[in-house]
Amino acid sequence: MDMLQDLESLQFEYGVPEEDRIWLYLQGRSRGLMIEACAHATFFCKLLYNLRASLNKNQSSRHLSIGSLNSATPEEFKVGIIGGGHLGKQLAGTLLQLGPIPAESLRISTRRPETLGELQKLGIKCFYHNADLVSWADVIFLCCLPSQLPNICVEIYTSLEKASIVYSFVAAIPLPRLKLLLNHTNILRPQYQYDEDSVSVWGANKGVIAALQDPTILQATCPYSPAGGIILNIKWLEGVFYAALNICTARNMAHSQVLQLLSELFLSVHFEDCGKDTASCPKLQLTDFVSKAYGKNLSQERPFPWFDLTAVQLKETPFSQHLSSSPVLQDHLTHLYCASFGISLTKEQPVISTGFPSQ
């Protein structure tokens, strides 16, 4: 309960002149963008954590096994954050509290590590050495200013492994430029669109972690939801799938096993309309990700090819067509997203899955 909620003189808007109040919507937009960014990054890490855990079980047992996903050693999935500003701190806190990442598997490189005392008390290692962070981490989040990014890329590009995933929040630097700066293709960059006529649902008096535990706010962050006026470009979701394929390819896993594994992991949350017969639910097929001509010549034992994630997010892919033409697949992914944060959708909470741009 917020004891200051009804005290008008203590509200942010109180000191804003009447003629400037038309700009107050930007405050809600900024807050909503922060919440969405942290939510989508956390969802991504949850998926990758579960995927790597399942791959570890598969390699140790020499057969496909996806039970008890969280039994793998959590230290095997390492996350690094470059930038200790507001976004970097909020992201670290969200991953630690709502994600599967323990403190010892999360590190931050920032020019002023002494300002991150609260995070260090939680066990997160904070220091200033970008190259060391990149050589250690499996996923690297770029939470820096656009002006800082070129120098950071010079520092880190030689430390990137082929399988390292770079996740950039630096909206001002387009993907082709970032690919060139890093000499790297395994890059994800979410893009957001704004609806100026929307009503803010972002809960002005809640922190990011508390906001993502509110069912209304969490559902507003769903990839296909326009609620709150911030819409995620669905090319990001395609990039997430192809990033998962690259992880499996790095393990030299047969594509037939990969499809079975990803179907189990990504399409495992069913909704009421599925009923007891889940056999009719979507399953991932080879031609969902590669052309029919390529798939025809790919033997069952061969892994998927290595995908350029920057190209996936900039061009049409087989999965673009499959995803846009399958509302059932969209609904399954929406339910998976909400379930990953502990929220179950009901008939009173409809899935919104059509009519949004995917450019």
Swiss-Prot record:
Source organism (scientific name): Homo sapiens (Human)
| Any coiled-coil regions, as ranges | none
Keywords from the named record: Oxidoreductase
Q: Which PANTHER family match?
A: NADP-DEPENDENT OXIDOREDUCTASE DOMAIN-CONTAINING PROTEIN 1 (PTHR11645:SF58), PYRROLINE-5-CARBOXYLATE REDUCTASE (PTHR11645)
Pfam name, any one: F420_oxidored
**What Enzyme Commission number does this protein have?**
1.-.-.-
What is the similarity comment for this entry? Belongs to the pyrroline-5-carboxylate reductase family.
Protein name, as recorded: NADP-dependent oxidoreductase domain-containing protein 1
Give an example GO molecular function.
Answer: pyrroline-5-carboxylate reductase activity
Record's function text: Probable oxidoreductase.
Q: A Gene Ontology biological process annotation?
A: L-proline biosynthetic process
